[in-house]
């Protein structure tokens, strides 16, 4: 029998994930660049602005577990397509709020942003689910790092572009610019297919080109027919030491991202006296370093794995080293020059990005029956920082009147992330659920190479 020709379909899939994630984060970052103007125009204090910044996070967190359940119930393609369509629609609708009075416009803006948060909820669990299906273990770190690094690419683009547009002058143009690309990507998604089973020969070639790989068939589960995963599965994840360590680590890692997406541009304008245009450009520089660090972290992890190191060593080494490097942000408390603040912020963001391998770890550990739900639970913990970080910083500034203390909060936060992976997570393995009603989680597609499993 002729050997199927090796394909590169998975790289096209990865490109699609990168583009979707870029659009996802571009929408999240749009409001922060105008934060200083919003605060001035509406007479808001720091605490109130912090709550406004966290509004998206409330909806996003609330939607994680339902979004993950939908992925497991209906599959990646349908839910992913519906998510992109819905959040792009609500983003486009924000362009029309200028037709209303100020009070009504503000209410509508945040209602629409709330809906965008709900609609975007399945995106990252969907990404992790797709990566687990298409990429072998020894490529999964790089693949996860690439789609995750899209957040830095998006932030760099938004900071530079939105520095040219004031929120109260060009809101319609801005949201239309961010909403339309989502529908373009959606068209390609619907035309294609995220499931490997559509091309059996191509799937076999992908498997054969993935030595010791552990591709995981996430679409073939009887849980779909049984009405979705049981809540007992969530209890098993929440009582698993490894998973709780991963969740805690992700919360700490994400905190710096949300500081950068919310308060950093405001800091540059109010404390450093920069114009919105200059702040938008300057704030994009750490994002470039974050993008490079994100990709590098995945490459380092997969290189360690290919050289014979265990999965635990390969994933934990970049995470811990990256968290240590990110603590360099504390130096910003003791320098005055703008360029030094930006340089140390860039260094910290570079380190944080190297260590942002949480989604690779989730792809390595999630039970195949509830891969979407597991990713949603992971993202729920991670994005609790999107709610708490802006609010906590607002209270720090209001209570102390010294905004530099915002830099100090990241040292214990990232210390906890490193400690969590070193002492709580333990050995990284794919977990196996108790009380599964369909075939065991280790059942493979023909030719599939099995991941390591362990009981919860």
Curated annotation (Swiss-Prot):
InterPro entries: MFS (IPR011701), MFS_dom (IPR020846), MFS_Na/Anion_cotransporter (IPR050382), MFS_trans_sf (IPR036259), Sugar_P_transporter (IPR000849). It is found in: Cell inner membrane. Probably involved in the uptake of galactarate and/or D-glucarate. Belongs to the major facilitator superfamily. Phthalate permease family. It is a multi-pass membrane protein. One of its GO terms (molecular function) is transmembrane transporter activity. It catalyses: galactarate(in) + H(+)(in) = galactarate(out) + H(+)(out); D-glucarate(in) + H(+)(in) = D-glucarate(out) + H(+)(out). It comes from the Bacteria. The keyword GTP-binding does not apply. It comes from Pseudomonas putida (Arthrobacter siderocapsulatus). GO terms for cellular component: plasma membrane. Signal peptide: none annotated. Its main location: membrane. The chain crosses the membrane at residues 11-31, 51-71, 78-96, 102-119, 246-266, 280-300, 317-337, 341-361, 381-401, 408-428. This is Probable galactarate/D-glucarate transporter GudP. The gene is gudP. Keywords: Cell inner membrane, Cell membrane, Membrane, Transmembrane, Transmembrane helix, Transport.
């Amino acid at each position: 029998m002729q050997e199927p020709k090796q394909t590169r379909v998975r790289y096209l899939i990865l490109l699609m994930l990168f583009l979707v994630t870029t659009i996802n984060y571009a929408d999240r970052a749009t409001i922060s660049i105008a934060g200083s103007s919003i605060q001035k125009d509406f007479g808001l204090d720091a605490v109130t602005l912090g709550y406004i910044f966290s509004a998206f996070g409330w909806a996003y967190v609330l939607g994680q577990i339902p979004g993950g359940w939908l992925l497991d119930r209906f599959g990646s393609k349908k839910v992913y397509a519906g998510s992109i369509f819905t959040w792009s629609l609500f983003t486009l609708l924000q362009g029309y709020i200028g037709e209303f009075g100020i009070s009504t416009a503000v209410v509508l803006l945040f209602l629409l942003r709330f809906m965008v948060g709900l609609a975007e909820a399945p995106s990252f669990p969907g990404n992790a689910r797709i990566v687990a299906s298409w990429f072998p273990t020894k490529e999964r770190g790089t693949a996860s790092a690439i789609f995750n690094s899209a957040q830095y690419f998006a932030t760099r683009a938004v900071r530079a572009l939105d520095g040219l547009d004031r929120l109260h002058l060009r809101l319609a143009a801005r949201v239309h610019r961010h909403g339309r690309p989502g529908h373009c990507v959606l068209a390609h998604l619907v035309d294609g297919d995220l499931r490997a089973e559509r091309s059996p020969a191509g799937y076999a070639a992908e498997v054969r080109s993935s030595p010791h790989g552990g591709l995981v068939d996430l679409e073939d589960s009887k849980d779909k027919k049984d009405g979705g995963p049981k809540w007992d599965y969530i209890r098993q994840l929440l009582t698993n030491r490894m998973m709780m360590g991963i969740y805690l680590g992700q919360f700490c890692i994400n905190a710096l991202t949300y500081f950068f997406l919310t308060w950093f541009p405001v800091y540059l304008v109010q404390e450093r006296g920069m114009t919105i245009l200059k702040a938008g450009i300057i704030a994009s520089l750490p994002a470039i370093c974050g993008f490079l660090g994100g990709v590098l972290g995945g490459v380092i992890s997969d290189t360690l794995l290919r050289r014979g190191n265990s999965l635990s060593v390969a994933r934990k080494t970049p995470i811990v080293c990256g968290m240590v490097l990110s603590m360099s942000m504390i130096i910003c408390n003791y320098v005055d020059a703008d360029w030094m603040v930006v340089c140390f912020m860039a260094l910290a963001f570079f380190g944080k990005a190297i260590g942002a391998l949480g989604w690779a770890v989730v792809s390595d550990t999630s039970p195949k029956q509830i891969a979407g739900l597991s990713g949603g639970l992971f993202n729920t913990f991670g994005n609790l920082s999107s709610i708490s970080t802006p609010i906590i910083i607002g209270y720090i500034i209001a209570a102390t009147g010294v905004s530099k203390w915002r830099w100090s909060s990241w040292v214990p936060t990232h210390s906890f992330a490193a400690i969590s992976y070193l002492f709580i997570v333990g050995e990284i393995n794919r977990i196996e659920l108790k009380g599964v009603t369909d075939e065991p989680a280790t059942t493979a597609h023909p030719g599939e190479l099995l991941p390591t499993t362990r009981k919860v």
